[in-house]
Amino acid sequence: MTVLALVLTTMGLQAQNWPEWRGPAANGIAEQGNYPVVFSATDDVLWKVKMPGKGGSTPIVWKDRIVLTSGVGEDTDGEDGVLCYNWEGKLLWQTKLGNQLPGKHRRGSGSNPSVVTNGERLFVFFKSSTAAALDFEGKILWKTNLMEEYGEISYFWDLGSSPVLAGNNVVFAVMHEGASYLLALDQVTGKVAWKADRNYECKAETAQSYSTPLVVGEGGRTTLVVWGADHLTGHNAETGKMIWSYSGFNPTQRPYWRTIASPAVSEGIAVVPFGRGMHLAGMKCIGSGNMTGEDFLWEKKGIGADVATPIASNGKVYVVGHTGTVWCVDLYTGNELWKNEELVGNGAFFSSPTLAGNKLYVCNEEGDLYVCEVSTSGIKILNHTKFDDNFVSTPVLVRDRMLLRGTKNLYCIGN
């Protein structure tokens, strides 16, 4: 079996950066560090700053800068904004990019996609379909609007797919009930490098995908792995051409099977949550041509995540369900190693978890934050803290600190 490794989006990434939504290797795994474990909503909170509007994006970190997107103001009067802070919580700059398209979901916003950086430029995407590049002083280098260029985007809910970097391009995924596509723009100029149509016939709402592509490397080739519309597809990152595809996720063509959680990829295996959190499947992320459910390595019913993206590490997959159930399954077989239902709360677990060593950080929409120790035999809750806030973004663990973006505030927690 050819082994795939998640491609670092920037050559020479420094260990203590968090350049995109799911971290240094885009897999939800933090670099080794002495991260906070025991704390409260007040103790060890080094600082917190009030957000100027709604946003569900995860902060990114590059050197001494913390950057995130947010609405500036509310509803139709608000604007798409990019905010930059230092490690003392001081706002260094704020750049507005035009009128926002407000969120529809109670926890949604016009600023759900996270920033991605190559260390020189910041790339952003909003529900308004504005895509832009900025420098680290907040200057807009280029800006475009995908709806103006390619037609209306008809998501039922709120745009959730974050941009990713592949080679010299930044890639955006637009998967909805209209004409769907992948778009690669040159990082420097913003000009179109390629555009690849991605359309499938689906029942109501099923064509809509809020997942983020993954960039993986295999045999000297960089592949974009894309999940949505009942298909997992692999595309040549240089051209957008489809290399392989998997169908078979929805053989009875059920409606409303939109996809939110992104796949996890480890050791050449893609782990895909589907069926509104009721199914999980593993398949090889290599090859060519069209494959079906018969080509899955495994498929499990009753295990899955609707919104939170799983983590695959060291032959194990950690899955956080909608109500807080945590599963650990074998990467190669899908067999359940353990299941835990101790994480409780009044809200849904929309936030994707973060793994640091053997510590799993999990939070929910009603402000519950759990730090758990995971092992081959199970999970142990080390800390449960309740914040007066709402969490849908991913906990960021970097430089021995945790950044936590809530609806109300951005928190920095450390020892």
Predicted regions and their residues:
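Noncatalytic, solvent-exposed loop/strand surfaces
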Residues: A15-N415
